[in-house]
Amino acid sequence: NFSEDLIESDQETLSEEERAAVDALPSGNALLIVRRGPNQGARFLLDSDVTSVGRHPNADIFLDDVTVSRRHAEFKRSGKTFSVSDLASLNGTQYEGDRVESAELVNGSEVQIGKYHLTFFASKKDI
């Protein structure tokens, strides 16, 4: 199964601490981990229906880099499914290497916002 292989390969690159954080996620929650770029290793919990991302200090996820728009993107939760939506940002939002307006996220997939490469991990209880 491709998605299981993807999950396993991403899990192998996680530190013990990151793996424990992913394993502990309650149902309906997800985690973004900065894999490359500024703040590498930073973790962001997705635990609400809408999580804003941007360079604005009031953003739920504050990414302090000029490649990130003040109001860049939103992560949305619908049941146990998550998606990312670009908010007409200057540099766009990429999902698995392609610029997108919005995309439904799958476990282990990569979202790029500015210089930040974030890997999405869903709760194991929802996979």
Task: Describe every region a protein language model picked out.
Residues 1-63, 126-127:
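Intrinsically disordered, low-complexity acidic Ser/Thr-rich regulatory segments
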Residues 34-36, 77, 122:
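Residue-level signal for short segments within beta-strands and strand-turn junctions
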Residues 39, 91, 99, 124-125:
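Residue-level detector of flexible, active-site-proximal loop/helix-junction positions
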Residues 45-119:
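Forkhead-associated
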Residues 118-126:
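Short, Lys/Arg- and Gly-enriched loop/turn segments at beta-strand edges
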